[in-house]
Amino acid sequence: MATTNTFSDFKLASELPAWAKLQELYEKKGKTLSLKEAFATDEQRFQKYSRTFSNHDGSKILFDFSKNLVDDEILGALAQLAREANVTQLRDQMFNGEHINSTEDRAVYHVALRNRANKPMYVDGKNVAPEVDAVLQHMKEFSEQVRSGAWKGYTGKSIKDVVNIGIGGSDLGPVMVTEALKHYAGPLKVHFVSNIDGTHLAETLKEVDPETTLFLVASKTFTTAETITNATSAKNWFLSKTGNNPAHISKHFAALSTNETEVAKFGIDTKNMFGFESWVGGRYSVWSAIGLSVALYIGFDQFEDFLKGAEAVDKHFTSTPIEDNIPLLGGLLSVWYNNFFDAQTHLVVPFDQYLHRFPAYLQQLSMESNGKSVTRGNVFANYSTGSILFGEPATNAQHSFFQLVHQGTKVIPSDFILAAQSHNPIENNLHQKMLASNFFAQAEALMVGKDEAQVKAEGATGGLVPHKVFSGNRPTTSILVQKITPANLGALIAYYEHVTFTEGAIWNINSFDQWGVELGKVLAKVIGKDLDTTGETTSHDASTNGLINQFKAWL
């Protein structure tokens, strides 16, 4: 049962005075605001609407918001909306360990996981900092043993491969981060198994040797159906290859879990169990023990730097006024487009191959957090909430869906991300400069477009002219990073976490539960029993019955 909502004094964002003001501003100027004119009439627009974040190590990230459909008055009204929605109060309650996840009566305290300053952080009167630090120290010792070769498998050989078995937040984060930080990889290869489709596990097991493989079973409860099924199958494979001796399991399996009983029952030595608390949501768990595969891959010192980068954004988010608060501005712009321009999507395009899984990671972060239709006031929202987030790395994306972004009928607010310095500056930075030129050109093209006169001046005539016109005035945020390092990746993730938080706070929804994933799981268990029977299934609707029966006939 949902606890009494004490975190907002409004039921619907649409009831707030600033919401009505923004609707008025949209009609008056927002829907006709010309970015080309805005730049022509204000030479300081770039300086005025861009912000530079300084990371803990002195590296910088530039956030250019100037190509967005706003002016001073609109930004002022958005800031007022944040004040009326008590965004900063809710933020402070989150950082103070209060139970802002009202439907599950839990704190939302992933920020405590990157508290490398080790300042006291309390949940229910208990300082959790020592406990967080103890888990990190355990991760450090374990990862250094494995990476150095001191940890031996059952035949005395060192570990060469790590297989992380998890799903959702126990998979997406580590997959994305290990891909993004591949440049920092050490001696170990990492593999990830998430899908219950047996192909995922089978293909992974073809690549590893049981004598030199360490399996990480990532499930907080150690009861997640897909993960435990995959882990059990991996264990059976391991035993079948190693003389069926259960004593060998302890050298080749570790658990990222809090369920000591089930972990021990599985055969894992509980000394090799890494826990995390109920106040860590799955999609925010890469900072926790779930990040062990990352620490094994890039080394603990780099993993800690990753945490410190996120911590630096937390510091900025909690101490900077609304008008200069980078994640808050990002979230407010998202609300502006979603609710006043009727934008249904949010495009994120990393101009960086290492970040190729970043959009998929952000999909879960954004859509599982804010894909809600009921507010914290326990009423249905009468406005649009979570955006459909999508993206692919560029320049590949330019050759697939950018046609729709440039000339389609929808408003698609877009974030473009580029690292100025490549880890692979081949051909004297030729590739990097080509990549960067596309990063700058795409944002410029989306803004300036190409009118009929320009098309005709280029020689087009007749019916071809309208096909070559670009309307322009399409909003983008450009994020320019000095280099993709552990600290800067941590900062980018934390930026999007707090953007997501800001959106949810404005919409007055609980961004930290995920009841929408439950119903399908329940029905899957029921249908699983149907699939074990030989007779015809008749207990569902005609479509589901028909599909099940055809599957059984073909199985």
UniProtKB/Swiss-Prot annotation:
What reaction does this enzyme carry out catalytically?
alpha-D-glucose 6-phosphate = beta-D-fructose 6-phosphate
Q: Does the keyword Transmembrane helix apply?
A: no
Q: Which InterPro entries match?
A: G6P_Isomerase, G6P_Isomerase_C, Phosphoglucose_isomerase_CS, SIS_dom_sf, SIS_PGI_1, SIS_PGI_2
**Pathway stated in the Swiss-Prot or TrEMBL entry:** Carbohydrate degradation; glycolysis; D-glyceraldehyde 3-phosphate and glycerone phosphate from D-glucose: step 2/4
Its Enzyme Commission number(s) read 5.3.1.9
What are the catalytic residues? E368 (proton donor), H399, K521
Q: What is the recorded name of this protein?
A: Glucose-6-phosphate isomerase
